[in-house]
Amino acid sequence: ILGMLVAEYLYKKYPKYGKHAPVVTLVPFRDDLSCARGDIPRAWFGSPLRGAFEGVDMLDNEWVSPNVLRIFPKRKFAEDAPLGSTYRLLHYYYGKSGIKMEANRHLTLENIDILSCRGHAIYVTGEQQFWQYINVNVRPPANDPLRAVSSTADHHHVANSKGFMKLLGCAFTMGNDDCGNFHDNSYFGKRGGDPCVLLPANLRGIGLFSPKPGEELELFQDDYSPANWRGKIVKIDGEKIFLDKPLPEQKGEGFVCFKTRYGTRNIIVRDCDFVRHTARGLLILAKDVTIENCRFGYEQHGSIKFETGYTKRQWCEGYGVDNAVVRGCVFRMCNISGRASQGFVRDIMLAAYMKTDPSDEQPACPIIKNVLFENNKFYDLHGLVATISGSENVVFRNNEIHAGGECGGDLWYKGGFAVIGGKNIFIVDNAFFGDVPFAGVIEKKGAVENLNASGNRKISE
């Protein structure tokens, strides 16, 4: 389901030669496939609205010979991609997925290897509750350059659940998107002419939210301040959601809508490896989360994001973050591509997104609360350890930050922290080893209440 065309022509005859060969993504990799590259352009040929599903054509192409495929991307990509570079070419993005689970309870998956699949390797939705993975691995066969990808989308994706999940001793690698995405689908809607009708304020409409009669909704204003309203769905008519009571006053462009029957929470991730993959390590849009003794490395866009948000074009995800701990983990060479947000390249990110993803705008009421990072080790940073905004009660303590490595870049703030907005933020008792360029904390004036940066120290190696 995938291919690599490189200067050495690994294929004498490509398996799809003479057949239709859709091209969805081109991701630059090191020649030895040890990790993605961030110094040359990548390309995604999907549509934000049509997606990148199986059977959707993305890019015109034609066969030149049994092992040469000519593609017709936009001119800029063709001009900027260096000759002789190694790219991982994928024919699919979303697809059938490897293992799909919906509304199971008390389920264990153990000693499973998913070598490759179209779409998410593992996909969870519905009222799934009380389940665990023990030694479940998403990784292609070792030492086979022709098997250059595991999952063509996320390694593990939770679209909705009722929580209580364990991920123990697992390894996720070489997929084409996030290692783990834990959230519940939300919805961005607005008042219609009828006060009991909710209309879409997002171009994707109700599809991913999948509302059903009888479900109860809880509404928030578009800055995540409470609307103090709950009501039930009476019926669905096209894109219209009919409710059992009038909607409250709409103070902005719409309402962020949660389904009360879902709540992805109580997650334990322990002794796992998240390495050598596209996109991010873990996206946590959940409550009551423990991430312990895990290893993150050689990641394209950063290791962990605590977030919740909505956009006006694409996705609306998460019911907020509360009570999360990241302890005893090792982070090495994360955010290879130098992905920046809110003006800084970073590894860890805590932020909401509103209307666009990412966004500088942050909620009036912090939606990310009570997060602790302690006793972790960071090596070979591209930029900051973390950016923090839209958050309340966040602590980074007793962590080690080490200089040096090959991640690249000479950013003046490498190794430090940026607090862009929030309340009760503590960066305390951390150790900066070696010649860390910036052993400090950046604070956005007027946007932070009660920042404590104390007890941090530099140690010569």
Please place each PLM-identified region on the residue numbering:
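Extracellular polysaccharide-degrading/modifying enzymes targeting complex plant/algal/animal polysaccharides
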Residues: I1-S116, V124-T125, P140-V149, T173-R265
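Extracellular beta-strand-rich solenoid/capping regions of secreted or surface-exposed proteins
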Residues: I1-K12, Y93-N104, G119-E127, H155-S161, ...
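Extended hydrophobic/aromatic segments used for targeting, binding, or gating
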Residues: G126-T173, D178, T311-R327
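Extracellular beta-helix/beta-solenoid repeat scaffolds
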Residues: I1-L10, F130-P141, A153, F182, ...
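Leucine-rich solenoid repeat scaffolds
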Residues: A418-E461
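Short glycine/acidic-rich loop motifs that flank beta-strands on beta-rich extracellular proteins
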Residues: K96-G98, R118-V124, P141-D154, G163, ...
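Extracellular beta-strand solenoid repeats
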Residues: K100, T108, D113, Y123-V124, ...
